[in-house]
């Protein structure tokens, strides 16, 4: 289990991690599609031209740019390098939960499922519901019209099957009276 050096301002850490997830999703998608070196992809996604004013996420839907402030860079790096390092394990965990072969999934959905699976299995410092909610939000933003439902269902099943998450999920269930 790894940790992150997130900003300490209330709410800032969550936003910084959300930005890290979004940037990691785009970088992992690029890696899946091109096979480009992860180090080169990381440098490309973190590079900002100081002469160019930052573009807010969403202004350029194909390649949003991020200012250095407000991005949990260690978390971005952990996601970007953690997913490929455990790719076979993640794919084996996901495959039985899918309604079709992993290789036939939309590349963005595949990247998002792998990202969520890695976080669920490696980042016990982040609640399971937060991880799934963030993945659903990214699917709504970047995925096909109904992909958020698919992402939600698969990651929910995965979380419930992970022994490391069992105590957290059971406590959550009791809190909600289910």
Curated annotation (Swiss-Prot):
Keywords: RNA-binding, Transcription, Transcription antitermination, Transcription regulation
UniProt GO MF annotations: RNA binding
GO terms (BP aspect): DNA-templated transcription termination; transcription antitermination
InterPro entries in UniProt: NusB-like_sf, NusB_fam, NusB_RsmB_TIM44
Record-level GO cellular component terms: cytosol
Cysteines engaged in disulfide bonds, as pairs: none
Family annotation (Pfam families): NusB
Chain's role: Involved in transcription antitermination. Required for transcription of ribosomal RNA (rRNA) genes. Binds specifically to the boxA antiterminator sequence of the ribosomal RNA (rrn) operons.
Family: Belongs to the NusB family.
Protein's name in the database: Transcription antitermination protein NusB
Native source species: Alkalilimnicola ehrlichii (strain ATCC BAA-1101 / DSM 17681 / MLHE-1)
Gene from which the chain derives: nusB
């Amino acid at each position: 289990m790894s940790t992150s050096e997130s900003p300490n301002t209330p709410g800032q850490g969550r936003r910084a991690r959300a930005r890290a997830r979004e940037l990691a999703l785009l970088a992992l998608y690029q890696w899946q599609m091109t096979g480009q070196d992860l180090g080169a992809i990381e440098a490309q996604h973190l590079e900002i031209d100081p002469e160019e004013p930052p573009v807010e996420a969403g202004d350029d839907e194909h390649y949003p740019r991020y200012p250095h402030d407000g991005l949990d860079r260690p978390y971005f790096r952990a996601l970007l390098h953690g997913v490929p390092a455990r790719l076979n394990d993640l794919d084996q965990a996901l495959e039985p939960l899918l309604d079709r072969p992993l290789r036939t999934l939309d590349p963005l959905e595949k990247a998002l499922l792998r990202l969520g699976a890695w976080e669920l299995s490696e980042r016990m410092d982040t609640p399971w519901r937060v991880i799934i909610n963030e993945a659903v939000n990214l699917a709504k933003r970047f995925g096909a019209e109904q992909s958020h439902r698919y992402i939600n269902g698969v990651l929910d099943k995965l979380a419930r099957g992970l022994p490391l998450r069992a105590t957290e999920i059971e406590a959550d269930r009791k809190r909600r009276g289910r």
